[in-house]
Design a protein with these regions (language model features):
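A conserved ligand/cofactor-binding region detector
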Residues: 1-143
Length: 143
């Protein structure tokens, strides 16, 4: 998941968005003060810096500024907690959670696509598929 951890060159941010960059630096200062107050050791706090090695770390800013960090699927949340954002989880364990943001067949088919919903009901002989998604396997005979 490191590919999801977006970083921006400090010079670019400073050149294009100087006021935003100043705010980021103030947030960084506040963050480091908070880490000191929480008793986070210096090595860990340095690994968590919002601005590091000439880059603004957007995911770190997001975790710091947010009340919750959602891994969506349970396995992704565990990856975040165990490796990708491990330092952050150690400091803010209460913020990490997972809530799957998926759609349901009832919502997508029955409400958003009534024509397809009608066809499925017609082919299957009832609308039980809206409750029992496995009923859709009966459609394989039409494939």
């Amino acid at each position: 998941m490191p590919e999801a951890l977006e970083k921006w060159d400090c010079n670019l941010v400073q050149q294009l968005l100087p006021a935003v960059y100043d705010i980021i630096l103030r947030i960084e200062e506040q963050f480091m003060t908070e880490m000191y107050q929480k008793g986070v050791d210096k090595a860990q706090a340095n690994r968590m810096k919002l601005v590091q090695d000439g880059m603004v770390h957007m995911a770190r800013i997001a975790v710091y500024a947010s009340a919750h960090t959602n891994g969506v699927a349970a396995i992704h949340t565990e990856i975040l907690k165990d490796s990708v954002l491990k330092d952050w989880y150690q400091v803010y364990p209460e913020r990490f959670q997972n809530k799957t943001n998926g759609i349901t067949q009832r919502r997508w088919l029955a409400l958003c696509n009534p024509e397809l919903s009608g066809l499925l009901t017609e082919l299957l002989g009832s609308d039980d598929w809206k409750i029992h998604l496995d009923d859709l396997k009966q459609l394989e005979r039409y494939a």
